Amino acid sequence: MATSIATGSGKLHFKKICGGQGRRQTYCVSAFAFQRSIQKDLSRSCGVSKFLQVQRCNLSRSPIEENSKPLRTVTTSCLRDGSTKYFDFAVIGSGVAGLRYALEVAKHGTVAVITKAEPHESNTNYAQGGVSAVLCPSDSVENHMRDTIVAGAYLCDEETVRVVCTEGPDRIRELIAMGASFDHGEDGNLHLAREGGHSHHRIVHAADMTGREIERALLQAVVNDPNIFMFEHHYAIDLLTSQNGSDTVCHGVDALNTETQEVIRFISKVTLLASGGAGHIYPTTTNPPVTIGLMVKTWPNNLEVMGSSLGTTTLRIMPKGSYVATGDGMAMAHRAQAVISNMEFVQFHPTALADEGLPITPSKIRENAFLITEAVRGDGGILYNLDMERFMPMYDERAELAPRDVVARSIDDQLKKRNEKYVLLDISHKPREKILTHFPNIAAECLRYGLDITHQPIPVVPAAHYMCGGVRAGLQGETNVRGLYVAGEVACTGLHGANRLASNSLLEALVFARRAVQPSIDHTKSSKIDHTASDWWDRPVVPLSLGSDMLGKIVRRTREVRKELQSIMWEYVGIVRSTTRLETAEQRIGELELKWEAYLFQQGWEPTMVGLEACEMRNLFCCAKLVVSSALARHESRGLHYTIDFPNVVESKRLPTVIFPCALVNNTWSSRQLQNQHMR
């Protein structure tokens, strides 16, 4: 069945795909019969640049940077000119999915890893809990599958769940072989933690900094691989696509070098999107904050930078600034005619640190919420309201070990009923040494603000955390766009269903990054790089002609618009929803976008202009609208999507929401790819 869903300024074509008992029908994604009706594209959005600004100096280096060799820049063999580069594989994103994939395909060709910030600055690096995998004799794949499907409110694709749970242990062993160091027990075996929704201890972890350790190991391997070239501070603008009969084909990506303000065109045989989620459509998120400061970089004499040989060692200081999780991959894929699925399922982590409850209030508002890992509750942490009344047993028999959607809604209900701003998570009844061993990062962060978690409860509040929806992928990470693969949070593989089970995200990224390798290699064997392809599309330009004063005005207005959008999403598209509130959000977002776009063009913005903040804003608008429209299409409450107008689970609606690409009706600049699709 198909339903045409009206949006604020157009329509999207939705289709529900029935799969029965958590299993979707087996099909090749590229064989979808796409709806090409004349309907407006939801991705209408716009934005403004973030360059030519004075940023404060921040020269501190992360442990990953200190322990890694300088990342390789591109050699002339990959260049056509300074602004066009050719690779066998282009990887957008430097988290666990992107790096793991890059290391495998690098055995078969050259790889460009394109990342918008520092290479380590990804959601992976912020992941605390761990990776779930069946490594204990008392556990089983069937147990892990059952826990995943129950947490996903029976919307999971059973075939995907089985594949991921079965292949997980091997992916862990590969990480260990690559040098990742995980916690071990006194018996010498891996220490396996337990988290909410899991029936067994199966979480492999490195204290409460698991993602950081995995990222370190992967980055070190990437540095040592001669076929992988890292392009840091390169922001992906739009995918380069062509139409070949009924097929859309991906040929690479345009990216903005935010250090030099040049647009670089990457032409590749295969492109992997591993760009993460869209947490910054909300004002409070656990996703990485904005990276702002001054970058100092020394280039060795023997390297080529932007196609020019540096005769002497050069010190460059450049302004930088970007958010990480702004939905870039999802929005780019949507504009490129990729299928999007299950965007209504936004996971709010139930326990982010509530600054208002700390003994010492932070001097400034955080750019992101500090995550208190699921493992705290898994280790026996108890949730209380401010009267120290335990409340979770009133909501679910699993109490604190219930899945995230249940715990987040329960906390939200307590806060609204009691008119309070946070609840308390107490682990102080556990031995001090155990707390400090398992949660050193959390203990240190809380102690910065006068809170000793070995004696005091932690103030916590829900925050946007993870997108269960994304670009629809098959079992090998393939999409309906030829040459385009996806892995990690940007993808919707069917694993998570309506709610992600704790510590299944890194697992999914590892499994699908690995599964996408062979079809990618096969695709490169059957395709050639056309060295005239770079001329198929017009090149975006940087708006230097507007001048620094005008750009400053545009940037300030864009930041205001970003906050307005985030406020609308939190107020009307949060943990508990209603049809009226969703419709209000749809209308207000559409109006906000149109007003902002009009402002841009009044200031002299041109259709071909791009900037970091501009592209982030257009992508945030795109993802916000996808979430709202998907939520309006689901007339039931399931998993992370809870609406008071349809409070019950409806068996007949246990179907994934799929947003098919529409025929482009490009009545505004922001509703289309910056480059017109090449016709072949």
Label the predicted regions:
Residues 332, 338-458, 510, 519-526:
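An anion/pyrophosphate-binding glycine-rich loop and adjacent beta-alpha core
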Residues 270-297, 311-370, 401-402, 502-515:
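Glycine-rich loop(s) and the adjacent beta-strand/alpha-helix scaffold that form part
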Residues 174-262, 267, 353-354, 362, ...:
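Conserved redox-cofactor binding core of oxidoreductases
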Residues 2-89, 107-108:
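Extreme N-terminal leader/targeting segments of oxidoreductases
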Residues 106-128:
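Glycine-rich FAD pyrophosphate-binding loop
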Residues 88-113:
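N-terminal Rossmann-like FAD-binding beta1-loop-alpha1 element of flavoenzymes
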Residues 2-6, 78, 85-87, 118-120, ...:
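Glycine- and aromatic-enriched mobile tails/lids
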